[in-house]
Swiss-Prot record:
Residues that coordinate or bind Zn(2+) 1: C40, C42, C58, C61
CDD domains: CTU1-like
Assigned protein family: Belongs to the TtcA family.
Protein name in the entry: Probable sulfurtransferase
Record-listed ATP binding positions: G88, R183, G202
Annotated cofactor note: Binds 1 [4Fe-4S] cluster per subunit. The cluster is chelated by three Cys residues.
NCBIfam families, per database record: TIGR00269 family protein
Length: 341
């Protein structure tokens, strides 16, 4: 017997109602589950998903997590009374975030002193802009600032070194090779002069991984060993790296949520081609296996325990600073520059 038009209408209505009901239930469950996933463990709304830990973090818990890791790197021996820490500050995100975190970690430590060192290499249109960011930051957070100029210290700006083709005459391939050595020399010199117990450098986890893998690929065993060494005493101020366990992405995010203004433009002399390619390789590995950056660092630190190579440290005959030969690299360059000029 055929259904009447009335019965067919009722059946169609019931079918539509059932479909509608299931769709609403599915949508409700999806929204509810999504909401549940996007909550931080503290109950607040999450704003960041940390893939390698499989955690959703709210802004406050994210901030605490970053500072906890920096504190873990430093340890109780460094976070203590009557300590003086020099901070190498450039105006970029890493150094300013590092300075901000150190300010937070030491704000309740009696007689702890922080002093920032800003090295002005003399790069027009770049370093003068960075200096403005640094001065504003140090003023806002009441940090002592000492500005160190290449021109005052070695008699030349980096612009002059490059413009006059002194690099090729010194048998130096890139401006970064010259600049990096001189910067480290000057930071150590002034940290020592100011009586600092430690010198903080803003290398993040990505920087570590890139340098480690670049040295592996190039087979540069000497650099692999020296990169992990922490020289101290006898003319060296021990270097500390509070951002060692913090990925670059999270350094940027920390700067954003704390409204830290920093210089975003890269140095015009920076040569990022090889490092940039290595960065891409690490990003691919991290995407496929979250946490691989930490694995690279841990593996390297384990390897260092087996590379117990002792290098004889001498004193430079000119400046008195520690070096491996009779004259340190900076003094040997300055001698050659005088001969060239």
């Amino acid at each position: 017997m055929l259904d009447s038009p009335h019965n067919l209408y009722i059946k169609k209505f019931m079918l539509c109602y059932i479909i509608y009901y299931f769709l609403i239930c599915h949508l409700y469950n999806h929204i509810f589950n999504l909401r549940e996933i996007m909550l931080c463990s503290c109950g607040n709304e999450a704003f960041y998903y940390q893939k390698y830990s499989n955690r959703h973090l709210c802004k406050e818990c994210f901030k605490k997590d970053i500072e906890r890791r920096a504190k873990k790197v430093l340890g109780k021996d460094i976070i203590r009374n009557n300590v003086k820490i020099g901070i190498g500050i450039s105006g970029g995100k890493d150094s300013l975030v590092m300075a901000y975190i150190l300010k937070e970690l030491f704000k309740h430590i009696p007689n702890a002193k922080l002093i920032c060192f800003f090295v002005d290499e003399g790069i027009k249109g770049f370093r003068n802009i960075a200096e403005k960011y640094v001065k504003e930051f140090c003023k806002e957070y009441n940090l002592d600032l000492k500005i160190i100029k290449f021109e005052d210290e070695i008699g030349y700006t980096l612009d002059e070194i490059v413009k006059n083709d002194y690099l090729s005459k010194l048998n130096i391939g890139k401006p970064c090779s010259f600049c990096g050595v001189v910067r480290r020399y000057l930071l150590n010199k002034h940290a020592l002069k100011e009586g600092c117990d430690y010198l903080a450098i803003g290398h993040n986890l990505d920087d570590f991984c890139q340098t480690i893998l670049m040295n592996y690929v190039e087979g540069n065993i000497k650099n692999i060993i020296q990169f992990g060494k922490e020289f101290e005493g006898g003319g060296f101020v021990k270097r500390i790296k509070p951002l060692k366990l913090i990925p670059e992405e999270e350094v940027k995010l920390y700067a954003e949520i704390n409204n830290i203004k920093y210089q975003r433009e890269p140095c015009p002399y920076s040569s990022l081609s090889y490092r940039h390619r290595m960065k891409k390789v690490i990003e691919i590995l991290e995407e496929e296996k979250p946490g691989v950056k930490f694995s690279i660092l841990r593996g390297y630190e384990k390897l260092l325990k087996y590379l117990n190579v002792k290098e004889e440290i001498r004193r430079c005959e000119i400046c008195g600073f520690p070096c491996s030969g009779n004259i340190c690299k900076v003094c040997s360059w300055l001698i050659k520059l005088k001969e060239i000029k």
